[in-house]
Design a protein with these regions (language model features):
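Helix-loop element at the rim of GNAT/NAT acetyltransferase active sites that forms part
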Residues: 18-28, 194-195
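Non-catalytic accessory segments adjacent to catalytic cores
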Residues: 99-143
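A short, aromatic/hydrophobic, helix- or strand-capping loop or linear motif
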Residues: 23-35, 123-124
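Acyltransferase donor/substrate-recognition loop-hinge adjacent to the catalytic core
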Residues: 1-10, 133-195
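Short, solvent-exposed loop/turn segments at secondary-structure junctions
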Residues: 64-66, 126-129, 154
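Structured helix-beta-strand junction loops
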Residues: 21, 114-115, 174-176
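Conserved donor-binding loop and adjoining core beta-sheet/short helix segment
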Residues: 4, 10, 17-20, 34-110
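A structural signal for short, well-ordered beta-strand segments and their strand-loop junctions
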Residues: 49, 57-60, 118-124, 180-182
């Protein structure tokens, strides 16, 4: 059976249980994360969950009333036209399984049309590369690279640094540069004096 369901933020336990059932989920999909942005005024969080034959998917969005945008106040009726945006960070559909994606996106498009959603802006996750599975559904535009560093071991980190950065680190070590991590009042006082 193929179903597209909407999980509201008010059902946060079901929301998080659904998200945790996916291998590549990230904090950006969890209810507590999106609730903070709802409180900030970024829209109403919705989690879409699709389950079909050999395919499952989730998508978290912030639903915003376009009539409340300063450019449209007084020009559009409220609660009629909406847009979706990824919560701050990354999002987009996370898909698992080799099944046919067409029924998912047909159901999703129908839901959006039936509920007045006229656009969606997605910041896809650069590590999970979830946009790869849906180039034929979304207009995906690259906006620059993301820098990532494999932190699996100190040796791997060192090997992946550029020679210029390794030389700068050696120079700092030679000059006995100290790096502190923590909240020590004495460090803050020294910083203020230097600054």
């Amino acid at each position: 059976m193929k179903t597209l369901s909407v999980i509201p933020l008010s059902d946060s336990s079901r929301w998080d249980q659904t998200v945790h059932s996916f291998c590549d989920y990230d904090v950006y999909y969890l209810s507590g994360y999106v609730k903070a942005f709802q409180l900030h005024g970024d829209g109403d969080p919705i989690l879409f969950y699709y389950e079909g034959e050999d395919l499952r998917g989730i998508n978290v969005v912030m639903k915003r009333d376009i009539a409340k945008d300063p450019r449209f106040i007084g020009k559009l009726p409220e609660n009629q036209y909406f847009d979706f945006a990824t919560p701050y960070g990354y999002g987009g559909w996370l898909l698992e399984g080799p099944g046919d994606r067409k029924p998912l996106f047909t159901a999703y498009e129908r839901w959006c049309q039936d509920n007045g959603v006229v656009s969606e802006f997605v910041r896809f996750h650069p590590v999970t590369a979830n946009q790869e599975a849906i180039y034929d559904v979304y207009d995906v535009i690259g906006l620059g690279g993301t820098i990532a560093l494999d932190l699996s071991s100190p040796e791997t980190v060192w090997a992946n640094l550029s020679s210029k950065n390794r030389n700068m680190i050696r120079k700092a070590q030679k000059n006995v540069i100290h790096i502190y991590n923590g909240r020590f009042p004495a460090i803050y006082e020294q910083f203020q004096e230097i600054y």
